[in-house]
């Protein structure tokens, strides 16, 4: 069993019967990422913690299933439990800040961030560089860095210039770039996660 699946099961087994019922009801209305469907209501309401964990993992896969579970727990006011779930999911891989999804463990090389691991593919395939720059401006990029990247003539050269600043970045900075990529080019990120 994967770490994320175990963490989801652990969280759901620690809910009272009333909290589990509330969790399932919230799961029916929580906003989902594009491309994901809802677990059918009839099947969902009759499930225990173990069945629900299996259904979450089969419907949403481990990484997004854990993120979705943490979001629902947070909506229920169970911030501590949501934090524990995220910590257990990201343990040993350099925890991502709340709301930022880390790359799947199966695709990650020890010690390498998703951004570093897929550097060449990102340089070649990112098309919406301006959007990334706007998302990172003031948080990660200085005005001088922002202008230097924008001055490059092509998208690949802009991405190369952007990557020239990453050796000075910490995990949080790289997570912000990953989050911006997820928002602007989610299909590219999903494709790289599967590779």
Swiss-Prot record:
Effect of mutating residue 72 to A: Abolishes homooligomerization
Residues of crosslink Glycyl lysine isopeptide (Lys-Gly) (interchain with G-Cter in ubiquitin)?
Answer: 55, 174
Q: Which residues form a coiled coil?
A: none
Q: In which tissues is it expressed?
A: Widely expressed at low levels. Detected in peripheral blood leukocytes, lung, small intestine, spleen, thymus, colon and at lower levels in placenta, liver and kidney. Very low expression in skeletal muscle, heart and brain. Expressed in lung epithelial cells (at protein level). Detected in the leukemia cell lines HL-60 and U-937, but not in Jurkat T-cell lymphoma and Daudi Burkitt's lymphoma. Detected in the melanoma cell line WM35, but not in WM793. Not detected in HeLa cervical carcinoma cells and MOLT-4 lymphocytic leukemia cells.
What changing residue 13 to W does, per the record, is:
Abolishes interaction with NLRP2
Phenotype for residue 20 to A: Abolishes homooligomerization
- Consequence the record notes for mutating residue 12 to A: Abolishes homooligomerization
Q: What is the effect of changing residue 76 to A?
A: Abolishes homooligomerization
Q: Which PROSITE patterns match?
A: CARD (PS50209), DAPIN (PS50824)
What outcome is documented for mutating residue 12 to Q in this protein? Abolishes promotion of apoptosis and NF-kappa-B activation
Q: What is the effect of changing residue 67 to A?
A: Abolishes homooligomerization
Question: What keywords are annotated for this sequence in UniProt?
Answer: Apoptosis, Cytoplasm, Endoplasmic reticulum, Golgi apparatus, Immunity, Inflammasome, Inflammatory response, Innate immunity, Isopeptide bond, Membrane, Mitochondrion, Nucleus, Phosphoprotein, Tumor suppressor, Ubl conjugation
Q: Where in the cell is it found?
A: Cytoplasm; Inflammasome; Endoplasmic reticulum; Mitochondrion
Major place of residence: cytoplasm
Q: Name one GO biological process term.
A: apoptotic signaling pathway
User: Which InterPro entries is this protein grouped with?
Assistant: CARD, CARD8/ASC/NALP1_CARD, DAPIN, DEATH-like_dom_sf, NLRP_Inflammasome
Q: List, for all copies, the residue spans of the domain called Pyrin.
A: 1-91
Instruction: Kindly list the positions at which Phosphoserine occurs in this protein.
Output: 195
Listed SMART domains: PYRIN (SM01289)
Upregulating conditions: In macrophages, up-regulated by endocannabinoid anandamide/AEA.
Q: Does the keyword Membrane apply?
A: yes
Q: How does it assemble?
A: Self-associates; enforced oligomerization induces apoptosis, NF-kappa-B regulation and interleukin-1 beta secretion. Homooligomers can form disk-like particles of approximately 12 nm diameter and approximately 1 nm height. Next to isoform 1, also isoform 2 and isoform 3 may be involved in oligomerization leading to functional regulation. Component of several inflammasomes containing one pattern recognition receptor/sensor, such as NLRP1, NLRP2, NLRP3, NLRP6, NLRC4, AIM2, MEFV or NOD2, and probably NLRC4, NLRP12 or IFI16.
**What role does this protein play?**
Functions as a key mediator in apoptosis and inflammation. Promotes caspase-mediated apoptosis involving predominantly caspase-8 and also caspase-9 in a probable cell type-specific manner. Involved in activation of the mitochondrial apoptotic pathway, promotes caspase-8-dependent proteolytic maturation of BID independently of FADD in certain cell types and also mediates mitochondrial translocation of BAX and activates BAX-dependent apoptosis coupled to activation of caspase-9, -2 and -3.
The UniProt comment on domains reads: The CARD domain mediates interaction with CASP1 and NLRC4. The pyrin domain mediates homotypic interactions with pyrin domains of proteins such as of NLRP3, PYDC1, PYDC2 and AIM2.
Additional detail = In breast tumorigenesis, methylation-mediated silencing may affect genes and proteins that act as positive mediators of cell death.
> What name appears for this protein in its UniProt entry?
Apoptosis-associated speck-like protein containing a CARD
Tell me which species this is from.
Homo sapiens
């Amino acid at each position: 069993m994967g770490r994320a699946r175990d963490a989801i099961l652990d969280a759901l087994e620690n809910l009272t019967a009333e909290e589990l019922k509330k969790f399932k009801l919230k799961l029916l209305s929580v906003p989902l990422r594009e491309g994901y469907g809802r677990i059918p209501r009839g099947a969902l309401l009759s499930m225990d913690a173990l069945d629900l964990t299996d259904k979450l993992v089969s419907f949403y896969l481990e990484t997004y299933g854990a993120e979705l579970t943490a979001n629902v727990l947070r909506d229920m006011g169970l911030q501590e439990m949501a934090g524990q779930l995220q910590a257990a999911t990201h343990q040993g891989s350099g925890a991502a800040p709340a709301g930022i999804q880390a790359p799947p463990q199966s695709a990650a090389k020890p010690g390498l961030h998703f951004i570093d691991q897929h550097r060449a593919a990102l340089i070649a395939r990112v098309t919406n560089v301006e959007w990334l720059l706007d998302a990172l401006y003031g948080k990660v990029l200085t005005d001088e860095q922002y202008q230097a990247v924008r001055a490059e003539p092509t998208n690949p050269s802009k991405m190369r210039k952007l990557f020239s600043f990453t050796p000075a970045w910490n995990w949080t900075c790289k997570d912000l770039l990953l989050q911006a990529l997820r928002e602007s080019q989610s299909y590219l990120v999903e494709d790289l996660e599967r590779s």
